[in-house]
Amino acid sequence: MPKYKVIAHRRVHKFISDLKDENLKSTVKDALSKLENYPLALKEMDIEKIKGLEKTFRIRIGKYRIIFYVDGTEKIIYVTHAETRKKIYKK
């Protein structure tokens, strides 16, 4: 099965670097690396499609959410946002 390339926006990299909890930081990094195995990652992690947005999904890690878009033709996953649940759905 071909792997997907995961590209994260710089605000996602900033979010990860600003996390104080090292366990949470490694959990987020692991989740992003597991996305390379999309669509198998859908079964391994808490991933759901975002209603109203085509090919856009969210990963839930505790109170945090990671939003990503899947380009199936190019085999690329664009990670666009990462933030607390309270802040992420206001965007």
Model features per residue range: what roles?
Residues 23, 28, 36-39:
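Generic low-complexity, intrinsically disordered sequence content enriched
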Residues 33-58:
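A short, surface-exposed loop/turn module that caps and links secondary-structure elements
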Residues 2-5, 10, 16-17, 22, ...:
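Enriched for short, Lys/Arg-rich terminal
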